[in-house]
From Swiss-Prot:
Coiled coil: none annotated. Residues 309-357, 674-722 form the LRRCT domain. InterPro entries: Cys-rich_flank_reg_C, Leu-rich_rpt, Leu-rich_rpt_typical-subtyp, LRR_dom_sf, LRR_TM_domain-containing, LRRNT. Residues 30-61, 394-428 form the LRRNT domain. It comes from the Eukaryota. One of its GO terms (molecular function) is collagen fibril binding. GO terms for cellular component: collagen-containing extracellular matrix; extracellular region. Associates with collagen and binds to collagen fibrils. Belongs to the small leucine-rich proteoglycan (SLRP) family. SLRP class IV subfamily. Glycans are attached at residues 51, 625. PANTHER family: ANTIGEN BSP, PUTATIVE-RELATED, CHAOPTIN-RELATED. This is Chondroadherin-like protein.
Length: 748
């Protein structure tokens, strides 16, 4: 009776030993990190909130889903997940990640979802996302990204959703999303975007939904948006837009839904959406619209959302109501006034219900059509050039003044003189696209609260002395695209707290140095695309607080030593697209805070030794692209150390380049578009590149046998060079001390 029972125990023991040797059991029992939970049946591993500082190296190889939320990884090194080739989902939320090294995700060719939300990323280096050819969804929400470099997403050809919401983006460069051929939804909400380059959205042929709500767009970027030809849904709510019209150039043939809700819209051009033939739903809730013109859109518009606007249901709204009925468009707005119609739904009214004082239809004598408006006492309706009514008191004729936002606008009204009579508490005054050849003395009386003044495209040729009198709080002055050739200190005396002065696209031949003496707090001066030919001592004598100086696109041939000296706080200097034949090294003396130097597009041809020595300790970004560079001295970058983050040398004529040793902090180097001659003279550069964990784009143009090969990997060309064997020997312990060690610029 005992033998069968003994046989059973022997069988179970043998079975246990077999299972113990199986790969699955071995993985489950031996490879699960102690701080993690491994579910081998579903191939899930969870290591949440374990204070991990690096990715555990004993995670089962067959894992498909890895959850590392809430750890302290900070840096993701190259090949951090190379032992997990089967991963499809990777969650790295709230891991305090500050840097992703290039190649961090290489080997994850099956990954579908990468979640990097709620970390501390301020930049993404090129090649950081290499190896993710199957990725469908990338979450970068809630980081600290300030810029996007073209090419960052170039390896993500399968991506369908990209989430960049809740970052710190202020600008989208051209081709920012190049390579995203299948992306259908791009989320950019809750940033600080104010400018989109015209080609920013080029290269997104499949994009169907774009979220740009909660940004700082003051004008509709129609040219940029129209690049996304397949867009069906566009979300632009919660931006400080005050007006949009056909001139903004929005042309989206497939657009079905457009959200412009909760902005500052005061007027809308009748043909603003004339080039969106399939538009079905237009959301204008929560703006400052008192009425709308009949919109000239093709017949597919079916819903117009107007809730939360101060609609004034008087005779001026009849064309709108008649159009809504005729076009069979449903609307949900309600009347703010007059009193007898307050709270009435717009779509329940008849045209005869909308009347003004003196109308024959006003037979009941109630006399309330001209009663109190939201902005104050009674005033007649104000008309914009497109026929919209705009109610505010006081306010000059043909302008619109909104009490809630303290904004007043006369944009594009055809005015020949600066109007008067704006509300005394106005903070933003928009007078763009009128015709004021001269701005007279005391042109803005009573506007002591004014913060931002827009005078672009007004044909201004002169600001008379005292023109800005009384504008003690003015911070932003926009005078771009005018006819100015000079400015006097007397003209600016009334705005002593001005911080930002925009003078681009005028006729200046010199920096208006005398005028700057009246602006002791000026921090940013824009003089792009003028005709300035030189910078001389004294030009910036009054600009001691200046931090940003933009002189791109002028005719500058000389920057004299001492010309920039008074601006010791200067952080950004843009001298690109000028006629400089040499780096103005002497002029860089005395700029201890300079971080960004833009010299691209000048005919420099050569860089001598110590060209940037004066700003070596502070400089972080150096732009030398498209500068006809043919020769760079071996010590051209001497003085520049680990503080330099970006070096742009692309699109030059360099056949050779000395290795810029000592630049250990580089995060971006661009050497593309140079005709490098790959011979022994280039060996130092080859060595430097092999120790540099960055994508630089340097390729061989000659000899023909290696044309098109990357300098970094073209080792066969250099194997016969003197010194090549010494490099190989350097790797062995016996020769380590005798061979000179090449510094590595790897970021990890």
């Amino acid at each position: 009776m005992e033998r069968p029972q003994s046989s059973i125990w022997v069988f179970m023991l043998l079975l246990f030993m077999v299972l113990l040797q199986s790969p699955a059991w071995h993985v489950a029992a031996q490879r699960c990190p102690q701080t993690c939970v491994c579910d081998n049946s579903r191939r899930h591993v969870t290591c949440r909130h374990q204070n991990l500082t690096e990715v555990p190296n004993t995670i089962p190889e067959l894992t498909q889903r890895l959850d590392l939320q809430g750890n302290i990884l900070k840096v993701l090194p190259a090949a951090a997940f190379q032992d997990l080739p089967h991963l499809t989902h990777l969650d790295l939320r709230n891991c305090q990640v500050e840097m992703v090294a290039e190649g961090a995700f290489r080997g994850l060719g099956r990954l579908l979802l990468l979640n990097l939300a709620s970390n501390r990323l301020s930049t993404l280096p090129q090649e950081a996302l290499d190896g993710l050819g199957s990725l469908r969804r990338l979450e970068l929400e809630g980081n600290m990204l300030e810029e996007l470099r073209p090419g960052t997403f170039g390896a993500l050809g399968s991506l369908t959703t990209l989430n960049l919401a809740h970052n710190a983006l202020v600008y989208l460069p051209a081709m920012a999303f190049q390579g995203l051929l299948r992306t259908r939804w791009l989320q950019l909400s809750h940033n600080a975007l104010s400018v989109l380059a015209p080609e920013a959205l080029a290269g997104l042929p499949a994009l169907r939904r774009l979220s740009l709500h909660h940004n700082e767009l003051q004008a509709l970027p129609g040219a940029a948006l129209s690049q996304a030809r397949s867009l069906a849904r566009l979300e632009l709510g919660h931006n400080p837009l005050t007006y949009t019209g056909e001139e903004d150039g929005l042309a989206l043939p497939g657009l079905r839904e457009l959200a412009l809700d909760h902005g500052s819209l005061q007027a809308l051009g009748p043909r603003a959406f004339a080039h969106c033939p399939r538009l079905h739903t237009l959301d204008l809730r929560g703006n400052q619209l008192t009425t709308l013109p009949p919109l000239q859109v093709p017949g597919q518009l079916r819903r117009l959302r107007l809730q939360g606007n101060p609609l004034w249901c008087a005779c001026h709204a009849r064309p709108l109501l008649e159009w809504l009925v005729r076009a069979r468009v449903r609307s949900d707005g309600a009347c703010r006034g007059p009193r007898r119609l307050r709270g009435e739904a717009l779509d329940t009214l008849r045209p005869s219900d909308l009347r003004c004082p003196g109308d024959a239809a006003a037979g009941d004598g109630d006399g309330d059509e001209d009663e109190d408006r939201p902005a104050g006492p009674r005033a007649p309706p104000l008309r914009s050039p497109h026929g919209e009514a705009a109610w505010a008191t006081p306010c000059p004729p043909a302008c619109a003044c909104v009490a809630e936002t303290r904004h007043s606008t006369c944009d594009g009204r055809g005015l020949q003189a600066v109007p008067r009579g704006f509300p005394n508490d106005t903070q933003l005054l928009d007078l763009r696209r009128n015709h004021f050849p001269s701005v007279p003395r005391a042109a803005f009386p009573g506007l002591r609260h004014l913060v931002s003044l827009h005078l672009q495209h007004c044909g201004v040729a002169e600001l008379e002395p005292g023109a800005l009198a009384g504008l003690d709080r003015l911070l932003y002055l926009y005078l771009s695209h005018n006819q100015l050739s000079g400015l006097s200190a007397a003209a600016l005396e009334g705005a002593p707290n001005l911080g930002y002065l925009y003078l681009e696209h005028n006729r200046f031949l010199r920096i208006p140095g005398t005028a700057l003496r009246a602006l002791p707090t000026l921090v940013s001066l824009h003089l792009q695309d003028n005709a300035v030919d030189r910078l001389a001592p004294g030009d910036l004598a009054g600009a001691r607080a200046l931090r940003c100086l933009y002189l791109s696109g002028n005719h500058i041939t000389q920057v004299s030593p001492g010309a920039l000296g008074p601006a010791r706080e200067l952080e950004k200097l843009h001298l690109d697209r000028n006629r400089l034949r040499e780096v103005p090294t002497g002029a860089l003396e005395g700029l201890p805070a300079l971080k960004e130097l833009q010299l691209s597009g000048n005919p420099l041809r050569a860089l001598p030794d110590g060209a940037f020595q004066p700003v070596g300790r502070s400089l972080q970004q150096l732009f030398l692209n498209s500068s006809d560079l043919e020769q760079i001295s071996p010590r051209a970058f001497s003085g520049l150390g680990k503080g330099l983050r970006s070096l742009y040398l692309h699109k030059n004529q360099l056949q050779s380049l000395p290795a810029p040793l000592g630049l250990s902090g580089l995060e971006l180097v661009d050497l593309s578009g140079n005709p490098f001659h790959c011979d022994c003279q280039l060996l130092p550069l080859h060595r430097w590149l092999t120790g540099l964990n960055l994508r630089v784009g340097a390729t061989c143009a000659t000899p023909p046998s290696v044309r098109g090969q990357k300098v970094k990997v073209a080792a066969p060309v250099f194997e016969a060079c003197p010194g090549w064997t010494a490099r190989k020997a350097k790797r062995t312990p016996t020769s380590r001390g005798s061979a000179r060690r090449t510094p590595s610029l790897s970021r990890h």
